[in-house]
Amino acid sequence: MSQELDYPSSLSAPTSRKAETFSYLPKMTTDQIKAQVEYIISKGWNPAIEHSEPENAFSYYWYMWKLPMFGDTDANVVLAEVDACIKANPNNHVRLIGYDNYAQSQGANMLVKRGDM
């Protein structure tokens, strides 16, 4: 039987915190983020962008960047909005969400930029 290992993550140590899908993997490249956006669009989900200060990310609501991109089918438009959000909020966490209208929930949720801690 394999031994269970403890992961050294703590809310008191900001640099050890993990958040959202893919946070245990290396940072995604622009092409990998674009592939995720294309997946969200291919499922018919509505992309949305949110951001939050790192110190508030785990205990408060995140700010929505504009409105969800209802019916947007161009990944480059979504990526341009992600870049605009990052430029306007350079120290914040930025996440990409795919809202599933049918299930009335989030189909995808991932950090695309980790804020300075």
From Swiss-Prot:
Keywords: Calvin cycle, Carbon dioxide fixation
Example of a GO biological process term: reductive pentose-phosphate cycle
Gene3D superfamilies: Ribulose bisphosphate carboxylase, small subunit (3.30.190.10)
SUPFAM superfamilies tied to this protein: RuBisCO, small subunit
Up-regulation conditions: Both mRNA and protein accumulate at 2% and 0.03% CO(2), but not at 15% or 0.15% CO(2) (at protein level).
Record-linked SMART domains: RuBisCO_small (SM00961)
Pfam families in the cross-refs: RuBisCO_small (PF00101)
Gene Ontology molecular functions: ribulose-bisphosphate carboxylase activity
Record-linked InterPro entries: RuBisCO_ssu, RuBisCO_ssu_dom, RuBisCO_ssu_sf
Protein family membership: Belongs to the RuBisCO small chain family.
Extra remark: The basic functional RuBisCO is composed of a large chain homodimer in a 'head-to-tail' conformation. In form I RuBisCO this homodimer is arranged in a barrel-like tetramer with the small subunits forming a tetrameric 'cap' on each end of the 'barrel'.
Assembly description: Heterohexadecamer of 8 large and 8 small subunits.
Job of this protein: RuBisCO catalyzes two reactions: the carboxylation of D-ribulose 1,5-bisphosphate, the primary event in carbon dioxide fixation, as well as the oxidative fragmentation of the pentose substrate. Both reactions occur simultaneously and in competition at the same active site. Although the small subunit is not catalytic it is essential for maximal activity.
Protein name as annotated: Ribulose bisphosphate carboxylase small subunit 1
Originating species: Hydrogenovibrio marinus
